[in-house]
Amino acid sequence: MTNKQRLVHLFIEYLQIEKNYSALTISGYTEAIEEFVRFMNVQGIDGFEEVSYQDTRIYLTEAYEKGLTRRTISKKVSALRSFYKFLLREQLVKENPFLLVSLPKQDKRIPSFLYEEELKELFTVSDVSTPLGQRNQAILELLYATGMRVSELCSLKESDLDLSMDTVLVHGKGSKQRYVPFGSYAHEALITYLEDGRLKLKAKGKDRADAYVFLNQRGAPLTDRGVRFILTELMKKASGTLHIHPHMLRHTFATHLLNEGADLRSVQELLGHSNLSSTQVYTHVSKDSLRKTYMSHHPRAFKRS
């Protein structure tokens, strides 16, 4: 193991043990740092302490020339800045060359979401007479009812569900927990799945799956990739013209709440956002909702007799 690899390994351990970051987040950090190490090797830079501000500018220029988006570059810079902050704390370097690097200004993207008519169609495609269909229906209902992330859904255990109060304890990023309520549709879908479909799926698996709510066809805990595949297949059945991604039901949850008058702070808490700015991206509304509001409230929207 080279000295560079040793320092990267120490940083990854720090993210796992002290910061308690998710595997997905750590993977992103690792990829960014390893890519930068390859850049250092090409440039003939032996150690992290030798990297200068000018080197970081060359690195960024190459990233732009590769056609990377500003969002991707911003994530890489953020990861490297955190890495050097760790090295400084451990007194392994004397300065952070990424501290003066300005993060690229990102385009504000409006999250994609489903209209109510599209949701209704999506909720009718699962064959709820089968264990997998019952599971899929419970996944759809719970994702839309709570706005939780797919990774949070996959980590749910039976002890996290309170069906008497219709609430779920969600284990979010950075070991943060939050209670989120859900409605009658999600309640009914969960009851059907837990009392029938899940028992049949569990019988095919091993003891390690006992605690997890959502299981695959072999009785093992369902993964993020598994949920992504399920959502894609369900959307194909509902409408071949639409593409659904794992976060779309979360976007839809937030958008529909705000469109119906929920306050931003409450939605922030339900989503588990640490910053309000992360929630504000959902303040877009549909054209129909905008038109309805305009026609209802603008004094000169139409002539009154």
From Swiss-Prot:
Q: Which UniProt keywords apply?
A: Cell cycle, Cell division, Chromosome partition, Cytoplasm, DNA integration, DNA recombination, DNA-binding
Q: Does the keyword rRNA-binding apply?
A: no
The cross-references to Pfam families, in alphabetical order and at most eight, read: Phage_int_SAM_1, Phage_integrase
> Is Cytoplasm found in the keyword set?
yes
**Main location per the UniProt record:** cytoplasm
Q: What does this protein do?
A: Site-specific tyrosine recombinase, which acts by catalyzing the cutting and rejoining of the recombining DNA molecules. The XerC-XerD complex is essential to convert dimers of the bacterial chromosome into monomers to permit their segregation at cell division. It also contributes to the segregational stability of plasmids.
This chain belongs to which protein, by name? Tyrosine recombinase XerC
The encoding gene? xerC
